[in-house]
């Protein structure tokens, strides 16, 4: 099992370290084999050591299906105008989305990533509050399969292509038929699942303890039967936001800004309260990880700055070591 630390690949993150050797030393000290990176909107430094980046999280828009379908009335309803939508996405129509994915796949290949991660979900700002869905999971999965097959066609990519679960419409890892629909549709031999433990916990708002969360993850693995063998990677964190969701969803806040970007910023803090990305402290997750035996495990923990990030990752790795899951 290779263990990674999640880190945005941009100048602000890199500035927290005194060069690449300092970053490499930090990873070694923590017991990580490298990074799972995500593009930060900037060109990568030319001297970025490629061996540091083991995994690569592909770019994503939480709300992309109407862009891909070129459903302009829907975009106007959400953004207020097509001009605002164009500025947000960098263009309009399906090719805007596809080209951004192609460019990101090229970045991953150039870095020598061993795997890439692709979100399969769709949620608008309003849905994030109301929990009243505009699209079904089947719609999202079918469109995602179409996108994936389009961007992967015509080239032998040097990495595994892993789909990540969310708790919005799309791939949730709570319905084996939907999971099979997704995996069967992807025309890529080197494919699999990146199971996000916190996202799976978000799918069950009745959970109140880490132990309950671990049991629920185990139950979903049971439910999936032989499909569970498709899990090749894990995003390890925990999220117990059911009480918050119960009190703060089902309706739109009265004073949401009219400007889309202001509304986006305000809703982002709401989503962070749902998707908490906290480190595990309960050993209840250890038998689950032993059962999965992932090839890649990323410590994807919310933190502010280098010190907090290192402390959170270190604590979670200590927990794994207690269970004899120290890595490769």
Task: List PLM regions with ranges.
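Histidine-acidic metal/acid-base catalytic patches
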Residues: 1-3, 98, 102-103, 112-114, ...
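Active-site acidic/histidine proton-transfer and metal-coordination neighborhood
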Residues: 90-192
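Amphipathic, non-transmembrane alpha-helical secondary structure
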Residues: 21-25, 43-46, 98-109, 142-149, ...
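A short acidic, glycine-rich active-site loop
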Residues: 83-94, 138, 266-277
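Hydrophobic faces of well-ordered beta-strands that scaffold small-molecule active sites
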Residues: 2-10, 33-37, 52-58, 116-118, ...
């Amino acid at each position: 099992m290779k263990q990674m630390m999640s880190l945005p690949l941009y100048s602000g993150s890199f500035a927290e370290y005194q060069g690449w050797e300092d970053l490499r030393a930090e990873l070694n000290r923590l017991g990580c084999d490298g990074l799972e990176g995500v593009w930060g909107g900037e060109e990568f430094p030319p001297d970025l050591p490629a061996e540091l980046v083991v995994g690569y999280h592909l770019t994503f828009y939480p709300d992309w299906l109407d862009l891909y379908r070129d459903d302009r009335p829907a975009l106007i309803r959400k953004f207020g105008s097509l001009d605002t939508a164009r500025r947000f996405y960098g263009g309009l129509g399906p090719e805007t989305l596809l080209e951004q994915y192609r460019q990101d796949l090229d970045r991953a290949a150039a870095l020598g990533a061993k795997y890439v991660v692709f979100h399969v979900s769709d949620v608008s700002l309003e849905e994030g509050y109301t929990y009243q869905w505009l699209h079904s999971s089947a719609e999202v999965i079918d469109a995602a399969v179409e996108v994936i097959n389009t961007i992967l066609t015509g080239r032998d990519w040097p990495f595994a292509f892993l789909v990540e679960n969310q708790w919005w419409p799309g791939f949730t890892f709570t319905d084996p038929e939907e999971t099979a629909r997704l995996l069967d549709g992807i025309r890529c031999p080197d494919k699999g699942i990146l199971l996000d433990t916190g996202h799976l916990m978000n799918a069950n708002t009745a959970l109140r303890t880490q132990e309950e969360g671990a049991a629920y993850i185990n139950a979903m693995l049971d439910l999936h039967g032989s499909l569970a063998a498709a899990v090749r990677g894990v995003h390890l964190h925990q999220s117990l936001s059911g009480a918050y969701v119960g009190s703060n969803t089902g309706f739109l806040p009265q004073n949401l800004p009219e400007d889309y970007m202001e509304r986006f910023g305000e809703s982002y803090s709401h989503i962070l309260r749902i998707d908490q990305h906290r480190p595990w402290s309960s050993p209840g997750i250890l038998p689950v990880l032993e059962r999965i035996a992932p090839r890649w495990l990323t410590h994807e923990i919310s933190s502010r700055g280098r010190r907090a990030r290192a402390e959170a990752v270190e604590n979670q790795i200590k927990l794994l070591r207690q269970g004899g899951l120290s890595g490769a």
